[in-house]
Amino acid sequence: MAASPGSGSANPRKFSEKIALHTQRQAEETRAFEQLMTDLTLSRVQFQKLQQLRLTQYHGGSLPNVSQLRSSASEFQPSFHQADNVRGTRHHGLVERPSRNRFHPLHRRSGDKPGRQFDGSAFGANYSSQPLDESWPRQQPPWKDEKHPGFRLTSALNRTNSDSALHTSALSTKPQDPYGGGGQSAWPAPYMGFCDGENNGHGEVASFPGPLKEENLLNVPKPLPKQLWETKEIQSLSGRPRSCDVGGGNAFPHNGQNLGLSPFLGTLNTGGSLPDLTNLHYSTPLPASLDTTDHHFGSMSVGNSVNNIPAAMTHLGIRSSSGLQSSRSNPSIQATLNKTVLSSSLNNHPQTSVPNASALHPSLRLFSLSNPSLSTTNLSGPSRRRQPPVSPLTLSPGPEAHQGFSRQLSSTSPLAPYPTSQMVSSDRSQLSFLPTEAQAQVSPPPPYPAPQELTQPLLQQPRAPEAPAQQPQAASSLPQSDFQLLPAQGSSLTNFFPDVGFDQQSMRPGPAFPQQVPLVQQGSRELQDSFHLRPSPYSNCGSLPNTILPEDSSTSLFKDLNSALAGLPEVSLNVDTPFPLEEELQIEPLSLDGLNMLSDSSMGLLDPSVEETFRADRL
């Protein structure tokens, strides 16, 4: 009996049975554990899918993929929860639905009361039901009661925490309910049904239509056509263009002038991140087009070379200039520019309603007649003798010049490539269409005469009569027949300036003033009460400065001009309206020190507010 336990324990059959029982028990436990882990994994994956639906559309501030939302809504349905497919096909295609109290009169909640606002976005609307009214109100509080994790899908898609949403709220001009629903819901019946839907216990949201409020739909018919909200979408694009425009479809169609959904209103823009400046109106101090190919804008030195002279031109604003006269400043250019002056007197058309009426027209350039492109033989015309010096050729457009000057003088005329050998010299045939007194006073470039010899004949010239009421374009000291360009002359000028047209009716003689390199422009009401001399950096002006007078807030310009321009023989700005003094403003010539002062690179040309405006668009 004592050996029985040993023999029993040494029985391999019993030992193998124990091993088998242990293995079976371990296999059952392993199977149960695997089943449990499978259930946990499935539930975790399902939860992660729901989390992904709620969070990934605006996670990290990235914009949702809205390029195909409006066109193909059915492509989004298979990737979502099963309840979305049920909701998307249950009432699909129906236009008219019965009221909700037919189905569930006992389940009417406080959500149907007027004043309750529903949260939603473009994503929940595409697979919840067929949209009747294309308006998704945003910026509303979330739902009060949630029953299923998938029930707040559209609520979670309201992008309130991303940086693009902050960009939207910062640039929005109407932060409160941009649809104008009077604080009530702007949802049509299918959206109310989705928001007030009941959970049937299987994760499916049964959507029932709610009562349709006509005042919330802003008198829009129930099947709102696509063309109607597309036209409203085009009308609402009058606001400022945003920097996060998405090309293609519009994710947020809307009612009326909606500026709250601004990041997706850029269907008329280029689709990039740069702002659209075609409808942006602001008062700018820049007179010229932003031509980046010009590399001569920083050079303000006059020097002794006559190569600088042909590039002396000015930008003129058609709507803002009432008289632009020129004066002479530097002895190094007085010989070549002597009596070959170009002054422009334009009609004063005050446009007080346009904020940039004082902006200078970028395509209007006046060239000095000593330009080498006006060569010797093509400028031939009758020359008449008169006792006073020559009156400058004045391009004075009348009221019709708004249409004519847009094609006349272009900013792309090549001026610099002409050689110096074509410069104006003592040869009379170069300026044969000018009176002979002017030709006699045109001196060769190398020996520069003294300023006394040049300014003496100008002091003897009679001044232009002050008759702004009779001739608002600036009165002339010469009859009109003195400076009529013949058609042959106009064609010869056009040969040298292919993109420049000369209006024969608008060529009239103007008041004779000496040539000054920075031409002083006197503008309309925005310009007339305040001036400030600044060089124009964006012109094809070579190394001679263009001085314009943009808007500035100081009314002491006349003192500054009289102190900076000392000793001018005769230049007058005929002002007919807004100056407080009736007397004529006398401007003295600009000396070399004044030119050096104007060429200071530390003088800022851009207003800091304009730069901040462009930076704000790239947030």
UniProtKB/Swiss-Prot annotation:
Phosphorylation/dephosphorylation states of Ser-273 are required for regulating transduction of CREB activity. CRTCs/TORCs are inactive when phosphorylated, and active when dephosphorylated at this site. May be phosphorylated at Ser-391 by MAPK3/ERK1 and/or MAPK1/ERK2 or by some cyclin-dependent kinases such as CDK1,CDK2 or CDK5. Following adenylyl cyclase activation, dephosphorylated at Ser-162 and Ser-273 resulting in its dissociation from 14-3-3 proteins probably promoting CRTC3 translocation into the nucleus. One of its GO terms (biological process) is positive regulation of transcription by RNA polymerase II. Residues 103-150, 165-185, 375-431 are annotated as: Disordered. The modification Phosphothreonine is found at T160. Pfam families: TORC_C, TORC_M, TORC_N. InterPro entries: TORC, TORC_C, TORC_M, TORC_N. The keyword ATP-binding does not apply. Keywords: Activator, Cytoplasm, Host-virus interaction, Isopeptide bond, Nucleus, Phosphoprotein, Transcription, Transcription regulation, Ubl conjugation. It is found in: Nucleus; Cytoplasm. Residues 165-175, 405-431 have a biased composition (Polar residues). Predominantly expressed in B and T lymphocytes. Highest levels in lung. Also expressed in brain, colon, heart, kidney, ovary, and prostate. Weak expression in liver, pancreas, muscle, small intestine, spleen and stomach. The modification Phosphoserine is found at S4, S62, S162, S273, S329, S332, S370, S391, S396, S410, S443. Transcriptional coactivator for CREB1 which activates transcription through both consensus and variant cAMP response element (CRE) sites. Acts as a coactivator, in the SIK/TORC signaling pathway, being active when dephosphorylated and acts independently of CREB1 'Ser-133' phosphorylation. Enhances the interaction of CREB1 with TAF4. Regulates the expression of specific CREB-activated genes such as the steroidogenic gene, StAR. Potent coactivator of PPARGC1A and inducer of mitochondrial biogenesis in muscle cells. Binding, as a tetramer, through its N-terminal region, with the bZIP domain of CREB1 enhances recruitment of TAF4 to the promoter. 'Arg-314' in the bZIP domain of CREB1 is essential for this interaction. Interacts (when phosphorylated at Ser-162 and Se-273) with 14-3-3 proteins. Interacts with YWHAE. Interacts (when phosphorylated at Ser-391) with phosphatase PP2A catalytic subunit PPP2CA and regulatory subunits PPP2R1A and PPP2R2A. (Microbial infection) Interacts with HTLV-1 protein Tax; this interaction enhances tax transcriptional activity. Belongs to the TORC family. This is CREB-regulated transcription coactivator 3. It comes from Homo sapiens.
